[in-house]
Amino acid sequence: MGKIRLMHAKLHRVRVTEANVGYIGSITIDPQLLDRVGILPLEEVDIVNLNNGKRFSTYVFPGEAGTGEVCPNGGAALLCQPGDLLIIYAYEERDRSEVLQQGHHARVIVADENNQIKQFFHQTLIPTEEGKGVSFHSDEIILNGQPKNNPILSEN
């Protein structure tokens, strides 16, 4: 059936804390955010700047844990300024027939003004019984920074 790219991780409305033109490249992100959604260091990400509409791709570099750091570096720093809101997406390539048979899972963080977790979602594609399609489900695990009573919360 062929390969498709599906979003597997998203950091929604994270705020740029610094923009460093002098760095060689990438975007530096608090590793606690990366770990929560499953983005790896050096993984390619697509980024949308909600303040100016600019889009770009780069790779991720882990910053200091717990700081909420989101710092575009190098050329990417010219597309952002401190305070801008970004959406950062990571994709994985999957075989379409595999997704129709096994489903797909993505993790999404919606950040607060300090880049802490305001909301956390697990979004899943669940195969239909016929194996010819999928249904989409979005489960909110954290609301307003507080865990909801949900068994999925224990997953990383």
From Swiss-Prot:
UniProt name for this protein: Aspartate 1-decarboxylase
PANTHER family xrefs: ASPARTATE 1-DECARBOXYLASE
Active site residues per record: 26 (schiff-base intermediate with substrate), 59 (proton donor)
UniProt PTM comment: Is synthesized initially as an inactive proenzyme, which is activated by self-cleavage at a specific serine bond to produce a beta-subunit with a hydroxyl group at its C-terminus and an alpha-subunit with a pyruvoyl group at its N-terminus.
InterPro entries in alphabetical order: Asp_de-COase-like_dom_sf, Asp_decarbox
Modified positions (Pyruvic acid (Ser)) in chain numbering: 26
Major localisation: cytoplasm
GO biological process, one term: alanine biosynthetic process
